[in-house]
């Protein structure tokens, strides 16, 4: 990429609007089983990031649909450098091209001190953003939607999450903030096998585990927060990281809205709202040796709200958790008229001019006191203590 070759720390590479069709004959790098369509290996510096930004209000679209190397995993944007800032473009059409187990990614990050902002990752067979190595990264105001792997593993779509946060040991302070995930064939957000803490702040998850016509696909959790698989012999960290999920919203996901996923440590769950999921909140855990399932213990559960889930709260050992100011449907006699709006269409509407989430009244209690104490509407503009 000529622009990357010429860029130095402090530069901004402006990307003009229009559709950029990735050329199958000009893949940036092939390495082992991977093909990287665009590869970013050059770093900026502290206070002098290299920026790759959409020009003004123009809309660049990177269409990767024609890149289909046989028997390779395909990553559209492979980010290996640090002190980089990507903003304001779309990635679409990233393919899967083999039948066995594997995955493709629209964006995969390994660098540190990066900001990935206002990207739209959609209508592909690939994970939206997949974060592995690197520290101090912010994934800000991004959307991942309509992503479904219909090629590998009998087309069940089980590897395509909207956002994956799976940091390796030492990869600390990685945050997903203001993001949306909907109609991804597996989970909205997933941090299974994370070796360090992952934070989800003010993020939304809708209709995951389904296709756009509500055809059933993969697991279908809104927020899958933790876990290390089902095999006790799998090496696990001790202690496991204590993940943070606050100010988030989960709507009509196929499985759980918020799911502890057999994690080995309690989590911090503050000011989240769940609506019409199979399980609105599922706190299932395992002990530190990963040996057996148990009801969740050691969780801090403050100011959360649920309504119309098939199960409101499940797999929770309440006496062994801290619970405060929650408005769960089993305790509050809500009706549809208890809320200012239940208009789900507003949740996938256009973002604000600055890239922030659309301003909606969805699932906001009409009771002003309750609206200030519980649910994602109580979180706006706050940073409630997590520990």
State where each predicted segment sits:
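Right-handed parallel beta-helix
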Residues: 21-23, 28-37, 66-191, 197, ...
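A structural signal for beta-strand register positions
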Residues: 19, 56, 90, 120, ...
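Beta-propeller domains
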Residues: 180-247, 252-265
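Short, T/G/N/S-enriched strand-turn elements that build extracellular solenoid repeat scaffolds
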Residues: 2-6, 23-43, 191-193, 235, ...
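Parallel beta-helix/beta-solenoid
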Residues: 8, 42, 47, 57, ...
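Acidic, glycine- and Ser/Thr-rich low-complexity intrinsically disordered tracts
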Residues: 11, 21-23, 29-32, 158, ...
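Beta-solenoid repeat scaffold
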Residues: 9-62, 79-87
């Amino acid at each position: 990429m000529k622009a990357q070759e010429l860029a130095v720390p402090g530069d901004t590479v402006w990307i003009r609007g229009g559709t950029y069709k990735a050329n199958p004959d000009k893949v940036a790098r092939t390495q082992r089983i991977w093909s990287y369509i665009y590869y970013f290996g050059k770093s900026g510096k502290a206070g002098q990031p290299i920026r790759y930004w959409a020009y003004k209000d123009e809309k660049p679209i990177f269409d990767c649909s024609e890149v289909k190397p046989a028997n390779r995993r395909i990553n559209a944007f492979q980010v290996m450098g640090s002190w980089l800032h990507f903003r304001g473009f779309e990635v679409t059409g990233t393919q899967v091209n083999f039948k066995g187990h594997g995955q493709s990614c629209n964006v995969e990050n390994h660098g540190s001190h990066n900001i990935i902002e206002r990207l739209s990752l959609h209508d592909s067979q690939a994970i939206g953003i997949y974060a592995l190595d690197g520290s101090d990264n912010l994934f800000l105001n991004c959307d991942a939607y309509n992503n479904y792997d219909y090629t590998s593993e009998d087309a069940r779509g089980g590897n395509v999450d909207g956002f994956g946060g799976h940091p390796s040991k030492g990869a600390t302070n990685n945050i997903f903030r203001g993001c949306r995930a909907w109609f991804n064939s597996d989970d909205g957000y997933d941090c299974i096998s994370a070796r360090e803490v992952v934070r989800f702040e003010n993020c939304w998850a809708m209709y995951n585990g389904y296709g756009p016509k509500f055809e059933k696909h993969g697991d279908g959790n809104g927020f899958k927060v933790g876990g290390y698989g089902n095999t006790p012999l799998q090496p696990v960290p001790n202690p496991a990281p204590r993940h943070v999920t606050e100010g988030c919203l989960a709507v009509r996901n196929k499985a759980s809205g918020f799911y502890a996923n057999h994690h080995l440590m309690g989590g911090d769950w503050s000011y989240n709202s769940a609506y019409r999921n199979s399980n609105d909140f599922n706190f299932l855990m395992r002990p530190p040796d990963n040996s057996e399932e148990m009801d969740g213990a050691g969780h801090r559960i403050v100011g959360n709200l649920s309504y119309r889930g098939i199960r409101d709260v499940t797999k929770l050992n309440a006496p062994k958790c801290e619970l405060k100011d929650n408005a769960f449907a089993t305790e509050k006699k809500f009706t549809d008229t208890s809320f200012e709006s239940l208009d789900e269409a507003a949740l996938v509407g256009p973002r604000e001019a600055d890239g922030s989430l659309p301003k909606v009244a969805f699932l906001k209690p009409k009771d002003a006191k309750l609206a200030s104490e519980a649910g994602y509407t109580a979180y706006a503009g706050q940073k409630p203590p997590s520990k």
